[in-house]
Amino acid sequence: MSQAIVVAALYKFVTLEDYVELREPLLKTMLDNNVKGTLLLAHEGINGTVSGTREGIDGLLAWLRNDPRLVDVDHKESYCDEQPFYRTKVKLKKEIVTLGVPGVDPNQAVGTYVEPKDWNALISDPEVLLIDTRNDYEVAIGTFKGAIDPKTETFREFPEYIKANFDPSKHKKVAMFCTGGIRCEKASSYMLGEGFESVYHLKGGILKYFEEVPQEESLWDGDCFVFDNRVTVRHDLSEGEYDQCHACRHPINAEERASEHYSPGVSCPHCWDSLSEKTRRSAIDRQKQIELAKARNLPHPIGYNYKAEA
């Protein structure tokens, strides 16, 4: 790869009794290796996306894997020319991905992991119910052929969607997927608790599928939304053509950018008629700051605010 920046999405569900104490040494390791991005720590594990040089990412991964609990931390890599993150953060959370249902613990019960090479065969089975566990704006960018879109705005809405639409006695086989594997892994734990018997989820998520399955064999249609400045990636993990509205965070394509309702950093066709005047003024001021920083060839810290896969 000629591109200088490595982007690593990583997570692991593992009991971290000392997650509060881990924050400072983890942050120091990221800073020492000049790694940017955000990692989330909770009692149930670690999650996040970071970026840096090859040496920097390797240094962080080596530090993490020196802890026996994180020796097999799941991570996927892609590459880009510029830093997709401006800040370095480690946040303490109740959950590393927020489902909001007490007692759901992938460390105790989880569905069957399916390797990317075996995914096509599974989802081609007509008896398998294929569910995209991501949010509506992500699904709109791309999904697996034949997948059901729950049309949820946040992962918190997923449990109610399942309760309202599916019956464990009728839906015997369920397969789920998400960007990096974390949401569908937690969703599988929830589904088992609800009585669904055969629950499968894509190991490593869409990004691992892109990495390991040749494009000519792919059952994916479209791009994949990612939680950094690239906005989307294609099947070859190169940066997609989408931008992102800084007002509503919705991905926008070339046609939407040509709309009369699109104003860079201020509004887009998805939000122009719903923004309050206060929000609009704030967005205009922020965009001026971003453009000023760009003119001075400086990164702007509010050009993108990291949001964990959720």
Swiss-Prot record:
Gene Ontology biological process terms, A to Z: tRNA modification
GO molecular function, one term: oxidoreductase activity, acting on paired donors, with incorporation or reduction of molecular oxygen
Keyword set, alphabetical order: Oxidoreductase, tRNA processing
Superkingdom per UniProt: Bacteria
Coiled-coil region(s): none
Gene3D superfamilies: 3.30.70.100, Rhodanese-like domain (3.40.250.10)
UniProt xrefs under Pfam families: Rhodanese, UPF0176_N
Active site per UniProt: 178 (cysteine persulfide intermediate)
Reaction(s) this enzyme catalyzes, per UniProt: uridine(34) in tRNA + AH2 + O2 = 5-hydroxyuridine(34) in tRNA + A + H2O
Residue span(s) of domain Rhodanese: 124-218
Family annotation (InterPro entries): Rhodanese-like_dom (IPR001763), Rhodanese-like_dom_sf (IPR036873), TrhO (IPR020936), TRHO_N (IPR040503)
Annotated PROSITE patterns: RHODANESE_3
EC number: 1.14.-.-
Xref: NCBIfam families: PRK00142.1-4
Stored PANTHER family: RHODANESE-LIKE DOMAIN-CONTAINING PROTEIN 7-RELATED, THIOSULFATE SULFURTRANSFERASE/RHODANESE-LIKE DOMAIN-CONTAINING PROTEIN 2
Family to which this protein belongs: Belongs to the TrhO family.
Record's function text: Catalyzes oxygen-dependent 5-hydroxyuridine (ho5U) modification at position 34 in tRNAs.
Protein name from the UniProt record: tRNA uridine(34) hydroxylase
Gene name tied to this protein: trhO
